[in-house]
UniProtKB/Swiss-Prot annotation:
Purpose: Member of the eIF2 complex that functions in the early steps of protein synthesis by forming a ternary complex with GTP and initiator tRNA. This complex binds to a 40S ribosomal subunit, followed by mRNA binding to form a 43S pre-initiation complex. Junction of the 60S ribosomal subunit to form the 80S initiation complex is preceded by hydrolysis of the GTP bound to eIF2 and release of an eIF2-GDP binary complex. In order for eIF2 to recycle and catalyze another round of initiation, the GDP bound to eIF2 must exchange with GTP by way of a reaction catalyzed by eIF2B.
Cited PROSITE patterns: S1
The organism of origin for this protein: Pongo abelii
Modified-residue entries (N6-acetyllysine), positions: K141
Signal peptide region: none
Regions that span the bilayer: none
GO biological process, one term: cellular response to amino acid starvation
Post-translational modification: Phosphorylation at Ser-49 and Ser-52 stabilizes the eIF-2/GDP/eIF2B complex and prevents GDP/GTP exchange reaction, thus impairing the recycling of eIF-2 between successive rounds of initiation and leading to global inhibition of translation, while concomitantly initiating the preferential translation of integrated stress response (ISR)-specific mRNAs. Substrate for at least 4 kinases: EIF2AK1/HRI, EIF2AK2/PKR, EIF2AK3/PERK and EIF2AK4/GCN2. Phosphorylation on Ser-52 by the EIF2AK4/GCN2 protein kinase occurs in response to amino acid starvation and UV irradiation.
A Pfam family it matches: EIF_2_alpha
Protein's UniProt name: Eukaryotic translation initiation factor 2 subunit 1
Superkingdom in the source lineage: Eukaryota
Length: 315
């Protein structure tokens, strides 16, 4: 059963000018033999002349066995099964789109393959039938192979009725919904940035407070921003969101507002860490750091109290 496999899309071969994801299997005199990952690993070839626009000095710098590459289809012979590919004709924009499509299609494939495992399918034909009755229905409906199924499955997390039109029995539907929810339910991410804000003028403390308050005002209902002091002049900014890209953008905007406000008062603004998604490990480390600083501050306060008491005793 581990051998179950199927192509990602309804058509068995890519079309000319399609940009596809391949894995390099071997390198020969004529070019590189590759497997088309979205088409059940059928073989294709990248001719040496199609590897680079420049003169090739070292083929290993351009392509390596085991590496995934984005390539464009330049010829397909469906009868003989020949597929000629080009790496040099793929633009950076096309490469990004290919990566996005492959990632989403692979997610759909993983969901359906796991459904097949749970339902104890034993043949590739059963998996292909599942694709025909689910993913390919949406790909065809929305005329967007790869994207149609992914978007429909994502929508099914909040509205499972989108699957009602599919030809599925009760078990298949239940297992499919469970797997869609497991893989596609949005996960909240925490985004963090570290900044330094200081102002050494007459009203420096008020200027810092005002600048930080302006940053906090960039919060939205779904994306509240928090600012905590690590140790003057360093602060940590955080927000939690389901939308990673939007979260990074909102935190960047808040930083820009703080910078503008503090510099109006001739203060100083430095970025210690650009906005990034943080892990539990990062959070644990920050908590430890802040705890240590609190202890140090408490010790300093204790020393001050002792000195004050000694001074009173002397008086």
């Amino acid at each position: 059963m581990p051998g179950l496999s199927c192509r990602f899309y309804q058509h068995k071969f890519p079309e000319v000018e399609d940009v596809v994801m391949v894995n390099v299997r071997s390198i020969a005199e004529m070019g590189a033999y590759v497997s088309l990952l979205e088409y059940n690993n059928i073989e294709g070839m990248i001719l040496l002349s199609e590897l680079s626009r420049r003169r090739i000095r070292s083929i290993n710098k351009l392509i390596r066995i085991g590496r995934n590459e984005r390539v464009v289809v330049i010829r397909v012979d469906k009868e003989k099964g020949y597929i000629d590919l080009s790496k040099r004709r793929v633009s950076p924009e096309e490469a990004i789109k290919c990566e996005d499509k492959f990632t989403k299609s692979k997610t759909v494939y993983s969901i359906l393959r796991h459904v097949a495992e749970v339902l104890e399918y034993t043949k590739d034909e059963q998996l292909e039938s599942l694709f025909q009755r689910t993913a390919w229905v949406f790909d065809d409906k929305y005329k967007r192979p790869g994207y149609g199924a992914y978007d429909a499955f994502k929508h099914a997390v909040s509205d499972p009725s989108i699957l009602d039109s599919l030809d599925l029995n009760e078990d298949e539907r239940e297992v499919l919904i469970n797997n869609i929810n497991r893989r596609l339910t949005p996960q909240a991410v925490k985004i963090r940035a570290d900044i330094e804000v200081a102002c050494y003028g007459y009203e420096g403390i008020d200027a810092v407070k005002e600048a930080l308050r302006a940053g906090l005002n960039c919060s939205t209902e779904n994306m509240p921003i928090k600012i905590n002091l690590i140790a003057p002049p360093r602060y940590v900014m955080t927000t939690t969101t389901l939308e990673r890209t939007e979260g990074l953008s909102v935190l960047s905007q808040a930083m820009a507002v703080i910078k503008e406000k503090i510099e109006e008062k001739r203060g100083v603004f430095n970025v210690q860490m650009e906005p990034k998604v943080v892990t539990d490990t990062d959070e644990t480390e920050l908590a430890r750091q802040m705890e240590r600083l609190e202890r140090e501050n408490a010790e300093v306060d204790g020393d001050d109290d002792a000195e004050e008491m000694e001074a009173k005793a002397e008086d």
